[in-house]
Structures are given as structure tokens and as C-alpha cells.
């Protein structure tokens, strides 16, 4: 377990009439739906749909005081007339790579803006309920049900069933955790989905058997030096230094830091226990989903708004089908060709950018935007932007911000509702209801477990088991698709070409040229321009790893522990925030006299104590390393300058050339994309965040997309700093008031 540690539609052809097909309900997503252009048939049961626009409309960009909107692609809307040839997959280049066995990088993945832990969601839910009660607004209250007393035999059967599913869950979790741990120890990289599954499984194991904290965690800490010796691939080779003592200390620091972060994430994943909870939230969610899926009965608006919050972006995107992913990419004008992981990565980054922009727009005010800015904002969110009045643009943007920021409806659900092209006359609640009907069954299972955790109710072992098995099946399916892509890539190599390249084997004898007789009337000339895409600017997985190694070497040369210190400070902030959230939850429950019923689990308390001990050990290791470096090569006159995390483009290019040869033009293109202010310098810590974000996904991106990722991360950091400053000011004001 200690090893998880290292956390680790371009151009389009003309519209053609489709053959007669069965009628489908309005708002349904067809596999052949092209949602970037309403001229394409198959969206609804209609046989002819007018184009949204007949002239090219180049995208405009929304800017707030020098903070531009990032955009993945820049292309005009399709035209209603000019099209000489039909688009074919051959016009786009799809790069497929096989499985790569790479060392797990010691970098923490960038967390999306606003991603909350279970305890933070519980706190938000309590605050929302109390606020509505104080304001006298509508609060969801389930219908009163007559409590039926169970017989003794029924109670015994329920308990036996509960423990049966609990032991099954424990056995399956243990098998999955052991398999993932073995993959990590052998140098394999866990995907984002696998890491999330591993984190949840560890939280389940500690929840089911709290005594494991006393056995597993100290045992892991004791065996860390042995594991590092037996499994050298667990750490990147760039940890090798001239000083054996310094190398040992750095490895120990890296592993302890990542282990402490992982344990803190596990603590935050474990829900609180509410002794007064009667399981109503789980039953209410089951009844709600049964209404919209089976009976056809319309739930109340309060139910729809309440349960829609559970379908978070990550949960929704990870379980959408490929036709739905393609439809969303086309709606948001993203590349719709590639693997499912690539499409999800594109959508995730776009949704993160939209979420950051929503907060900026809300801060500046919708009324302060110009018409072009309103059109750009609406178009980026999949809403109609052309041929409507300014008041209409402001109205639909204000409605979006109200649903997203005030009602906390996930961005993925809002985008998916736009992709279905539902009538504008439908209310937001009805649009969300229609959207929830299209989600796969696995999403409902995950949301059912989540609602129990947020409300502090007893988690149903059967529901948890079903969700775990479904997620494991999805992970295995991804592995099969990866192997299939690798085998197809091997088949593309012609056997004759492979044999001709063998040493000592003569090549094929040249055949005499044969002139073909071509009749003039049979010659077909294609006058359409060739779509080149991003050829020459793609960044492969191997090049990402080379860039990662170069950053590690540069950090080693600078003898910098800035990254470790920053991660330790973030870990301390997480621990403090967790403690403050616990106190706030008890404070909110004290308003209704229920604070005595809420308690932290025994495993969570034990893990918290262990994390506090590890933080003290990490502080000691950092102090020891700094002392070693000062006693070694770094003297008083050779101290590291103030801007130690800033490197020049020339340094980065030289470091990458030392590892492996990369074409000069690609190096220049990549470094230019990373240098957003064009001053010739790059912050190596920011570069590490981008590498870590891309390295966790098995995708290949372009240098343009790298620049957009940098812009998105910068926006998120600015917003996070503003929110922290605002929270600090509110706390100080509350302390002064008290």
C-alpha cells in the first residue's frame, strides 16, 4: 500500500439525408448524432433540421482583466453550403500506443477546483438545510411513512444478509487491493480510475476492520526501506545521487510524504457516523430514481435539485458511453476522435475551465459583459449564441450560473442537458430529470452509496459491493481495450517490411515498373484541401516521461526541497481543514440538538493520530536533508538563489537532450507553449503539475493543449487564492464579533 504513494471534430462534410428510421423520443441521443451542427440528422425524430448558422462564425474570447478564457480548439462553425468531400476517418491521425511499463512518478495529481471530500459534502449539506430553515425556503421533506415493526426472524435474516455481503465485500476488496499493490511494486502506473478505486477500497477495509490501522500502517512504515530495496522501479531513477546518505534520506522523505497524503485522503474518504440516521436518504434516493426510470412519475423540484448534486463530473464522465462522449465533444467543439480516455480528458479539462470561468463571471457580473463576450460564454457552454437577443443571452447565462453556483448542479449534467437539445420551454428541473434518465445504471449505484456517506447513514454493504464490482468491470474493460489497441498497432506493421529490416537478409528484388493505362474520363481529381491536424506537434507518452525526468534532474541539480516543503504545508492545511470541518459539523448539528449523535469512526481517529506522527517525522527529515546539503556541496557563497524554482528554456531543452534525442522544432514548440508570458523562463513547479496531470492519463496531447492546461491551472490557482483569502477574512470577522 505504501507505494500508491507515488501518485502516481475537426472539419465536417455535407449533411446527407438519412434513410427512414424508427421514431425516437424528443431529446434522445442517437449514436450518429452530431451535436455541433443541427443540420446533421439523427438528433431527434425530425427528418429535416435547419442549420444554426449559414456563415462562418469565428470564436471570440471572454476576458476579465487579463484572464482569457481557455479554449481547446479554434475553428469556425460549419457552413451550410460549401463542402466538396465527405469527411473520413483517414483525414485525422489517431495515435495509439500499447501498454507502457513506466515508473510511478512521485507527483501529486492536480485536484480539480472545488473537489470536496465526504466530510466537506456533509458540512455543505447541513449548512444548506439550516440556511433554508432559517430563511423559510423550500426544504425537501420525505413523506411520512408508517414504520412497520419487523419480526425477530426478519431481523435475524437482515443481519445475516448484511454480514454475508460484508464478508464478500471484505474478500473482494482484499483481492483487488493486493492486485493493484503488486502492479505498483512492479513499476506499473495506476490510472486515475484505478487509483480512485484503490483509495475507496482502503477506506472500506479500514471501515470494516478498524483494527487494521494498528497492524497495517506501522508494518508499512517499518518495511518501507525493505520495499525500496526489493522494488527499485517503484521510484524513478532520477533519485540516484552521488551521496548515498542523501539518496536514502530523499527516498525516505518522498515515500513518507506520499504515504501521509494517501492516509489523509483515506481519512477524508471515510464518512462520519450518525447514530440518529434511519436510512431515509438511501430509501428516498432509490424511490426518486425509480420514479424517473420506471414509473414515469414526476418527482418534486426539491427532489430533483437535491439528488442532482450527487452526480459529480468525474462520476458522470467516467461512466458515459462512447456515443455520449462523442456527442459532448462535438457540442463543445472538441476533437471527437480518439480513445475514450482522451475524450474524457478533454471534457474534464474543459469542464474545469468552465467552472473557473463561472466564478469569474459571477464576480464581475453578467451585465458587465459585451455582446461578443456573452456569445462566447454561451457558446462555450453549449447554449445557443447566434440569432438571439442580448437579453436572451443574459437570461440563459444567468440561469446557468444560478444552477451551477447557487444550486451546485454539476457542470457535466448541465452540458449533457444541452446536448439533448431539449425544448426551451422545459423548466430547468424537467431538463435535469430528462438528463438523469439517460445516465447508465452504474452511475445510480455510485450515487446511492454517496448519498449514504454524505448523510452519515450506515452504508449498505450490498450496494457498496455492487458498485465496487461494476467499477472493477469497467477497469478490466479499459485494460482489454488497451491490449486490443496494442495488438492492432502491431498488426499495422507489414511482415515484409519487418523482414527486410533484419540484418544480413537481402531486401526484396526490385520489380520492373509497369505502366498503367489510365483513361482521361476515369481520372478523379480531389480539389479539397488536405486536413493535416496536429501532425508534428503531438506529445507522446514517452516524451512526457522524458520531460518528467528532465524536471527531476533540474530539481536535483538545484538541491531544491521547495516542492516537498509545499506538499508538506498542503498536507498540514488538509489536516487542519478536516479538524475544522468536524467542529463546524458539530456546531451546525447543535442548532437542532443532534450533535451528540454524530461521531468520527474509530479507524479515522487512529489514522489521524498516525498522520500527525508522520508529519513530525517528515519535518525532521527535511531538516536533516537541509543540514546534509549545507555540509556538502552548498557553501555560504553557493546558496540557492531566491528564485530557485524558475529555470530558463535553454536549461530545460539541454536537460531533455541529455536524456534522449527529440527533434529541435518539437522542443521549441513545447517550451514555447509552457512559457505563457514569453519571458524565456519557466516555473519548474508549475511544469511538474502539468506533467503530473497528463502523466496520470494514457493520452497524447498537442503543444496547444499543453498551453491551455497551463492557463486553466493558473485560473484555478488564482480563484483558490481568492477563496482562501475570503475565508480567512470571514473567520477573522467572526472571531472579532465573538
Swiss-Prot record:
It catalyses: Ca(2+)(in) + 2 H(+)(out) = Ca(2+)(out) + 2 H(+)(in); K(+)(in) + H(+)(out) = K(+)(out) + H(+)(in). Disruption phenotype: Knockout Letm1 homozygous mice show embryonic lethality before day E6.5 and around 50% of the heterozygotes die before day E13.5. Surviving mice show reduced mitochondrial calcium uptake, impaired mitochondrial ATP generation capacity, disrupted early embryonic development, altered glucose metabolism and increased susceptibility to seizures. The chain crosses the membrane at residues 208-228. GO terms for cellular component: mitochondrial inner membrane; mitochondrion. Inhibited by ruthenium red or its derivative Ru360. PINK1-mediated phosphorylation at Thr-191, positively regulates its mitochondrial calcium transport activity. The modification Phosphothreonine is found at residue 191. Residues 115-135, 247-283, 445-492, 537-626, 707-738 form a coiled coil. Residues 229-738 are mitochondrial matrix. One of its GO terms (biological process) is negative regulation of mitochondrial calcium ion concentration. Keywords: Acetylation, Antiport, Calcium, Calcium transport, Coiled coil, Ion transport, Membrane, Metal-binding, Mitochondrion, Mitochondrion inner membrane, Phosphoprotein, Potassium, Potassium transport, Transit peptide, Transmembrane, Transmembrane helix, Transport. Residues 662-697 form the EF-hand domain. Ca(2+) binds at residues 675, 677, 679, 681, 686. SUPFAM superfamilies: EF-hand. Residues 115-207 are mitochondrial intermembrane. The modification N6-acetyllysine is found at residue 596. Pfam families: LETM1_RBD (PF07766). Residues 1-114 form a transit peptide. Homohexamer. Interacts with BCS1L. Interacts with GHITM. Belongs to the LETM1 family. Plays an important role in maintenance of mitochondrial morphology and in mediating either calcium or potassium/proton antiport. Mediates proton-dependent calcium efflux from mitochondrion. Functions also as an electroneutral mitochondrial proton/potassium exchanger. Crucial for the maintenance of mitochondrial tubular networks and for the assembly of the supercomplexes of the respiratory chain. Required for the maintenance of the tubular shape and cristae organization. Essential for early embryonic development. This is Mitochondrial proton/calcium exchanger protein. The gene is Letm1.
Amino acid at each position: 500500500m505504501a507505494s500508491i504513494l507515488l501518485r502516481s471534430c475537426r472539419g465536417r462534410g455535407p449533411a446527407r439525408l438519412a434513410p427512414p428510421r424508427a421514431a425516437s423520443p424528443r431529446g434522445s441521443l442517437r449514436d450518429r448524432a452530431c451535436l455541433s451542427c443541427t443540420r446533421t440528422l439523427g438528433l431527434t425524430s425530425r427528418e429535416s433540421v435547419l442549420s444554426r448558422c449559414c456563415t462562418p462564425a469565428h470564436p471570440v474570447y471572454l476576458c476579465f482583466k487579463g484572464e482569457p478564457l481557455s479554449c481547446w480548439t479554434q475553428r469556425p462553425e460549419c457552413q451550410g453550403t460549401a463542402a466538396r468531400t465527405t469527411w473520413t476517418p483517414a483525414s485525422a491521425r489517431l495515435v495509439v500506443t500499447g501498454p507502457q511499463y513506466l515508473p510511478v512518478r512521485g507527483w501529486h495529481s492536480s485536484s480539480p477546483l472545488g473537489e470536496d471530500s465526504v466530510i466537506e459534502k456533509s458540512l455543505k449539506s447541513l449548512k444548506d438545510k439550516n440556511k433554508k430553515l432559517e430563511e423559510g425556503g423550500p426544504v425537501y421533506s420525505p413523506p411520512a411513512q408508517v414504520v412497520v415493526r419487523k419480526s425477530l426472524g426478519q431481523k435475524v435474516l437482515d443481519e445475516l444478509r448484511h454480514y454475508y455481503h460484508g464478508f464478500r465485500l471484505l474478500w473482494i476488496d482484499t483481492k483487488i487491493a493486493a492486485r493493484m499493490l503488486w502492479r505498483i511494486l512492479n513499476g506499473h502506473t495506476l490510472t486515475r480510475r484505478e487509483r480512485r478505486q484503490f483509495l475507496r477500497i482502503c477506506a472500506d477495509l479500514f471501515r470494516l476492520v478498524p483494527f487494521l490501522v494498528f497492524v497495517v500502517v506501522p508494518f508499512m512504515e517499518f518495511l518501507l526501506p525493505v520495499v525500496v530495496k526489493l522494488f527499485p522501479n517503484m521510484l524513478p531513477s532520477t533519485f540516484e545521487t552521488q551521496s548515498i546518505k542523501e539518496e536514502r534520506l530523499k527516498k525516505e522523505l518522498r515515500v513518507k510524504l506520499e504515504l501521509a497524503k494517501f492516509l489523509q485522503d483515506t481519512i477524508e474518504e471515510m464518512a462520519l457516523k450518525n447514530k440518529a440516521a434511519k436510512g431515509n436518504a438511501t430509501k428516498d434516493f432509490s424511490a426518486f430514481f425509480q420514479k424517473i426510470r420506471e414509473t414515469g412519475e414526476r418527482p418534486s423540484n426539491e427532489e430533483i435539485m437535491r439528488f442532482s448534486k450527487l452526480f459529480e463530473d468525474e462520476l458522470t464522465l467516467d461512466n458515459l458511453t462512447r456515443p455520449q462522449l462523442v456527442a459532448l465533444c462535438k457540442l463543445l467543439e472538441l476533437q471527437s476522435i480518439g480513445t475514450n480516455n482522451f475524450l474524457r480528458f478533454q471534457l474534464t479539462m474543459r469542464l474545469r475551465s468552465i467552472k473557473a470561468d463561472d466564478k469569474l463571471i459571477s464576480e464581475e457580473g453578467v451585465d458587465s459583459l459585451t455582446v461578443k463576450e456573452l456569445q462566447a460564454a454561451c457558446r462555450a457552454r453549449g447554449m445557443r449564441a447566434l440569432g438571439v437577443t442580448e437579453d436572451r443571452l443574459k437570461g440563459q447565462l444567468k440561469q446557468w450560473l444560478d444552477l451551477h453556483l447557487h444550486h451546485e448542479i454539476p457542470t457535466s449534467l448541465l452540458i449533457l442537458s444541452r446536448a439533448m437539445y431539449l425544448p426551451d420551454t422545459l423548466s430547468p428541473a424537467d431538463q435535469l430529470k430528462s438528463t438523469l434518465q439517460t445516465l447508465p445504471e452504474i452511475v445510480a449505484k455510485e450515487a446511492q452509496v454517496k448519498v449514504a456517506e454524505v448523510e452519515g447513514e450506515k452504508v449498505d454493504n450490498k450496494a457498496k459491493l455492487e458498485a465496487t464490482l461494476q467499477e472493477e468491470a469497467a477497469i478490466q474493460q479499459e485494460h482489454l481495450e488497451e491490449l486490443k489497441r496494442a495488438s492492432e498497432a502491431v498488426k499495422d506493421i507489414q511482415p515484409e517490411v519487418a523482414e527486410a529490416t533484419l540484418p544480413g537478409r537481402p531486401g526484396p528484388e526490385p520489380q520492373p515498373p509497369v505502366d498503367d493505362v489510365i483513361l482521361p474520363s476515369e481520372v478523379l481529381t480531389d480539389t479539397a484541401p488536405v486536413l493535416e491536424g496536429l501532425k508534428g506537434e503531438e506529445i507522446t507518452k514517452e516524451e512526457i516521461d522524458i520531460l518528467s525526468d528532465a524536471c527531476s534532474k533540474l530539481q536535483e541539480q538545484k538541491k531544491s526541497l521547495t516542492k516537498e516543503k509545499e506538499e508538506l504545508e498542503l498536507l498540514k492545511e488538509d489536516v487542519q481543514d478536516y479538524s475544522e470541518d468536524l467542529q463546524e459539523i458539530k456546531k451546525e448539528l447543535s442548532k437542532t440538538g443532534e450533535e451528540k449523535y454524530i461521531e468520527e469512526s474509530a479507524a479515522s481517529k487512529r489514522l489521524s493520530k498516525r498522520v500527525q506522527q508522520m508529519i513530525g517525522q517528515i519535518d525532521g527529515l527535511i531538516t536533516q536533508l537541509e543540514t546534509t546539503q549545507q555540509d556538502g556541496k552548498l557553501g555560504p557563497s553557493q546558496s540557492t538563489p531566491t528564485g530557485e524554482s524558475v529555470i530558463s528554456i535553454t536549461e530545460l531543452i539541454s536537460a531533455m537532450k541529455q536524456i534522449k534525442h527529440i527533434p529541435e522544432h518539437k522542443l521549441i514548440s513545447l517550451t514555447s507553449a509552457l512559457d505563457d508570458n514569453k519571458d524565456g523562463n519557466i516555473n519548474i513547479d508549475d511544469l511538474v503539475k502539468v506533467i503530473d496531470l497528463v502523466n496520470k492519463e494514457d493520452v497524447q496531447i498537442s503543444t496547444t493543449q499543453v498551453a491551455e492546461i497551463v492557463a486553466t491551472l493558473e485560473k484555478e490557482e488564482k480563484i483558490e487564492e481568492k477563496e482562501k483569502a475570503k475565508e480567512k477574512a470571514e473567520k477573522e470577522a467572526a472571531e472579532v464579533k465573538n
